[in-house]
Amino acid sequence: MADDKKGQMGNVDDIQAKLDKRLGPEYISKRVGHGTTRVAYIEGWKAINLANQIFGFNGWSSEVKSVTVDFMDERQGRFTIGCTAVVRVTLSDGTFREDIGYGTVENDRRKSGAFERAKKSAVTDALKRSLRGFGNALGNCLYDKDFLSKIDKVKFEPPDFDEGNLFRATDENNELSRANTVTDHSEGPAPKKRNAPLPPAPRPGAMRPEAAHAAPAPSEPPLERPRSSENDQEDLLDDSFMFSDELQDDDLINIGSAKKAPSGVPRPAPPPPPRAWPPQDAPVAFVTAKAAPDLQAHGPVPPTHLFDPKFQAQSIRHTVDQTTSAHVKLSVLREKGIDQARDDIYSKFAPKGKILPPPDTATDPDPTLAARPALSAPQNLPTNTSSIQRPTMIELPKLHFPQPTAVPLPNVPASRREVGRPKQSPPSLRKPPPQ
């Protein structure tokens, strides 16, 4: 019991020694405050890293006690929000600190984004202020102006980027494989692989059908396969798992023609059927349907590769003869419930630019006349202008206005009056003080 208290006190003393130290310049950031002053602060992620280094990753916890929205203003589609948050930081021994934080967002276009940023900034501010209560190493030294005036003179070099210190996915896989290997070796030695002995090959004299039918082979119990470790299973994997499990074309052809042979008599595999292949020097290329018959007539082509222009797929239903070009039969139209003449159908679906007459007027027998543009009248045709009367000019009487007479204005002295200033006489017009 005494040893536990001593160890706990030693741990507390170590934590207290770390908390008494002040922050280095690499942990301190600056921002513009009110006016021209610069405010020193510590970022939230740096404060969390310091807490993990001092207390341990499982030596402290944070709890959001409350979040309050103080105000929310909307003006011209932009939102301004202010939030207050209370956060408590508790250590593993029950010691806790609690403080308040504030977060604001101004002129945000999205309402949800404004709430998110305001609440997060309020919680982060409250967390930093709660951690500040534990000591200088967690941000309490930033309120010492004498310390801030001296820390600005301390120079430091930013740490170099260490690629070997990155957490990679390959590291996790290596740890898992190493743990599996240690577990397998700790359980005991792996069982050795033993291949079941094959039965001796029968002699030619013993391979007779009478003996095979008369003496059936005794049924042997299935051999139990030894359990192998996961490493043995990994050794058995090969490249065959990378290919498709579908049967090849040759296997599909041989499935129907394969026959079951007697269990005791081995049957040789049937020879492959002969195939008609073109000569090795024949070029292979894609040609059009019109050039295919000429190419097939000049060179040998396998029957399976011949081009059939009249081939029709069985999976497609053909209702119209595709080999000829003809009008749709009237019987087919009547089956579909269309009793109109073919010309009426064509006039309904007029070409682009054709003006169709309204349905209540008589249609033009020739549907192409309406699509023709109207001829413009020639410019040099004589016109009859004898019936056109020229406009007559009407003279309006002239109006005479009397000339204005000069009116004498009173002789008033000119004065200056300034607009926007109080009435006061200029300095030159002021009365001289009495002597």
Swiss-Prot record:
Bias type Low complexity, positions: 206-217, 361-375
Residue spans binding DNA: 128-132
Keywords: DNA damage, DNA recombination, DNA repair, DNA-binding, Nucleus
Any one Gene Ontology BP term: meiotic joint molecule formation
Region (Disordered): 161-281, 349-435
Record SUPFAM superfamilies: dsRNA-binding domain-like (SSF54768)
Feature: compositional bias, Pro residues: 265-281
Gene Ontology, cellular component aspect: mitochondrion; nuclear chromosome; nucleus
Polar residues biased stretches: 377-390
InterPro entries: DNA_recomb/repair_Rad52 (IPR004585), Rad52_fam (IPR041247), Rad52_Rad59_Rad22 (IPR007232), Rad52_Rad59_Rad22_sf (IPR042525)
Main localisation: nucleus
Keyword DNA repair: yes
Subcellular location: Nucleus
Gene3D superfamilies, alphabetized: DNA repair protein Rad52/59/22 (3.30.390.80)
UniProt GO MF annotations: DNA strand exchange activity; DNA/DNA annealing activity
Function recorded in the entry: Involved in DNA double-strand break (DSB) repair and recombination. Promotes the annealing of complementary single-stranded DNA and by stimulation of the RAD51 recombinase.
Subunit structure as annotated in this protein's UniProt entry: Part of a complex that includes RAD51, RAD52 and RAD59.
Family named by the database record: Belongs to the RAD52 family.
The protein, known as: DNA repair and recombination protein RAD52
Source organism of this protein record: Eremothecium gossypii (strain ATCC 10895 / CBS 109.51 / FGSC 9923 / NRRL Y-1056)
